[in-house]
């Protein structure tokens, strides 16, 4: 059995790490490189960096900080933000990233997933899915351009349909960003995770809602996700990664101990 992964998420805007609640009202957390090093030193299995306004601004993630991160950490990291072409991805990977993640650009051009997977291998291609539960329809819908609330829009895709579509096109991993839970710290949406797990054949990462160590345990035990991504509980030092891993190991979760 592969070890479960603990993945701090660093949302980047204007060269700094920020964090919002339900993808809105972002506050500045700190500088990118020191935070990345701190999480690596604490025992994170990998890091994810999202330049949250790159796609809506029509630009690609700033590669200068990607190179600086690669110099100070020795764990895998994934970068997302406005990647629209093989050339965009190649440049980010050449600066030291281990994976690239696409979200809004994949919705705009789903063939991008296949082209990237064919060029770099599926193990390198992550698709992020920003999913929102609509009380009015009782359905989960995929959202686009969520890094800027002025540009966010609901797409035609229901979440489960998009999960299956991106797998068929070559996604090697899926990060499910559950917008209703984001930053609220009341637990992952286990109902949604279980539904996605039933149709997801590639590694599945839960994102949005972690507030306690028990929330991580529930995601691993009840929804069988491969990794759990979180931001605010790590940024605000509510949970220490080393202590979290010790707790999970004590509960029988296969995890890499620092």
UniProtKB/Swiss-Prot annotation:
It catalyses: 5-[(5-phospho-1-deoxy-D-ribulos-1-ylimino)methylamino]-1-(5-phospho-beta-D-ribosyl)imidazole-4-carboxamide + L-glutamine = D-erythro-1-(imidazol-4-yl)glycerol 3-phosphate + 5-amino-1-(5-phospho-beta-D-ribosyl)imidazole-4-carboxamide + L-glutamate + H(+). Keywords: Amino-acid biosynthesis, Cytoplasm, Histidine biosynthesis, Lyase. SUPFAM superfamilies: Ribulose-phoshate binding barrel. It is an enzyme of class 4 (lyase). The keyword Ubl conjugation does not apply. Its EC number is 4.3.2.10. GO terms for cellular component: cytoplasm. One of its GO terms (biological process) is L-histidine biosynthetic process. Pathway: Amino-acid biosynthesis; L-histidine biosynthesis; L-histidine from 5-phospho-alpha-D-ribose 1-diphosphate: step 5/9. Its main location: cytoplasm. The keyword Zinc-finger does not apply. It holds the Pfam family His_biosynth. It is found in: Cytoplasm. One of its GO terms (molecular function) is imidazoleglycerol-phosphate synthase activity. Belongs to the HisA/HisF family. HAMAP family: HisF. Heterodimer of HisH and HisF. IGPS catalyzes the conversion of PRFAR and glutamine to IGP, AICAR and glutamate. The HisF subunit catalyzes the cyclization activity that produces IGP and AICAR from PRFAR using the ammonia provided by the HisH subunit. This is Imidazole glycerol phosphate synthase subunit HisF. It comes from Salmonella dublin (strain CT_02021853). The gene is hisF.
């Amino acid at each position: 059995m592969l070890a479960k992964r603990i993945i701090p998420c660093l949302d980047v805007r204007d060269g700094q790490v920020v964090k919002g609640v339900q993808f809105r009202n972002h506050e500045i957390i700190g500088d990118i490189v020191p935070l990345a090093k701190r999480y690596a030193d604490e025992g994170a299995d990998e890091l994810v960096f999202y330049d949250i306004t790159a796609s809506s601004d029509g630009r690609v993630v700033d590669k200068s900080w990607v190179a600086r991160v690669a110099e100070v950490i020795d764990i895998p990291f994934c970068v997302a933000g406005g990647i629209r072409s093989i050339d965009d991805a190649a440049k980010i990977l050449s600066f030291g990233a281990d994976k690239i993640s696409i979200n809004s650009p994949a919705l705009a051009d789903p063939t991008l997933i296949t082209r990237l997977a064919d060029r770099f291998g599926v193990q390198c291609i992550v698709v992020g899915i920003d999913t929102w539960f609509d009380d009015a329809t009782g359905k989960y819908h995929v959202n686009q351009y969520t890094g800027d609330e002025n540009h966010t829009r609901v797409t035609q895709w229901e979440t489960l349909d998009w999960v299956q579509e991106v797998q068929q096109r070559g996604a090697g991993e899926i990060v499910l960003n559950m917008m209703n839970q984001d930053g609220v710290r009341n637990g992952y949406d286990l109902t949604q995770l279980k539904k996605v797990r039933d149709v997801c054949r590639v590694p599945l990462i839960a994102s949005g809602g972690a507030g306690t160590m028990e929330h991580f345990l529930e995601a691993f035990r009840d929804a069988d996700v491969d990794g759990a991504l979180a931001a605010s509980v790590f940024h605000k030092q509510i949970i220490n990664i080393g202590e979290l891993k010790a707790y999970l190991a004590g509960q029988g979760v296969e995890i890499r101990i620092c």
